[in-house]
Structure formats: structure tokens, C-alpha cells
Amino acid sequence: KSQYNGIWVYAEQRDGVVAQVVHELLGKGRELADQLSCELSAVLLGYNLNGIAEDLFAYGADQVIQIDDPALKHFRDERYSEALSHLAEKYKPAIILAGATVMGRSFIPRVAIDLHTGLTADCTGLEIDSETGNLMQTRPAFGGNIMATIITANHRPQMATVRHKVMNPIVRDDTRNGIVLHEEYNFELEEDVTSFISFDKEKTNLVNITDANVIVSGGRGIKDAKNFAMIEE
């Protein structure tokens, strides 16, 4: 375990826009990295990634490790898991954090399998054990009736996905800067088992429920759709 060092945050982005949960993870990652006296790195995967690193530095990253490749233009489990696993095997981070998003839940378990380590999903709390230095990963269990704290005692890296709006980002500081490490990976495209067809973004004027600060809902007592007007009022 002594050869593993540093904390990584997978910097999920789509079309150059970083997911809000990444800023939250960088805030928690900054706190943990300061406790462990280690570097906090953000890992970027995709294509045409220019300008994204500056955003990650502003929210606490010391360095950004990225693979900018046409093969990563569209998200696909096998390519993203191969790329992140390759980087982790090379740099050997002690901790890898990712958002418990559709993307994170889809490919991060593959990375854990590739690296022969454990993964705690949907965490709501992350702390460092002051005696062992292990990452204590807390998540709801048994239908949310209890909170379980899990450690990956014998394997590295320690991996966790974290729910949106659980951690707090640090205050953005555009004067912060860091190092960008440009990496490459030779994708065996002919071995792909899936094909990208298209991505159609839903057009709506409604607020994304995951970004809402307050959610008001109605049950069967409403009886008729028109009665939702009372809730809207």
C-alpha cells in the first residue's frame, strides 16, 4: 500500500461543461488531501478538453491528468474504464472519487474490477481514519434504515462514488493554477463490443430535478391532475 499516494477525482464533463458533483468532490478531496498531506488530482477524459482544467484548478485541484482523444468523444463504458484504469495503474493513487451519476455508476465499477479493489457506491460521508489513514466511506444501507461505514483495508486504490449535493465545494478561486499532464492511450477500437449511434438531449423548460433546492410533491390525495394547481400556488 505504501506505493499508492494522492487523491483523484474523476472530472465528469459533457460538451465541455463540468458536472456540479465534480466541484463538490474537489471540495471534499481538498479537505482529505490536506489531512493526508498529498496532492489532489482531477482526471479528465474526453475530446477537445481545452479550457476545462482551469475550472478544476479554481475548485481545488493541484493537477489535472487528462486523455484528450477522439475515441473518448462520446461516453462508452469500455473506453472510459480502460482509460481510467490505465492511468490508475500508472500513477497509483491511494483514493479515487467519482460522482454517483448515470455515468459514474455505469463505468466506475468496471474500473474497480480492473484494479482488483473495492468500491463503495452512493456515499454520503467520507473521512480519514487518523490512526490507519484509511478512507472511511459512509453510505445508507438496508433501505436507508442504517448508515454503514466501510473501509478498503487491504487493497488500493480506495474507491467511492458520492451522491450529488452531499459535499460542499470550496469557494471558486480563479487565481489558483496547477499542472496539466497530457496522457495517451492506444484504444483497440476493433475490439469494441458496443457502437455509438446518437445522443439526443431532451429539450425542456423544466428545472432538472437533481438541481432543485426544494422539491414539492403530491400524492393520490390530489385525485385529479388539475388539482396540482393548488400545489403550484
Predicted regions and their residues:
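N-terminal glycine-rich FAD/FM-binding segment characteristic of electron-transfer flavoproteins
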Residues: 1-233
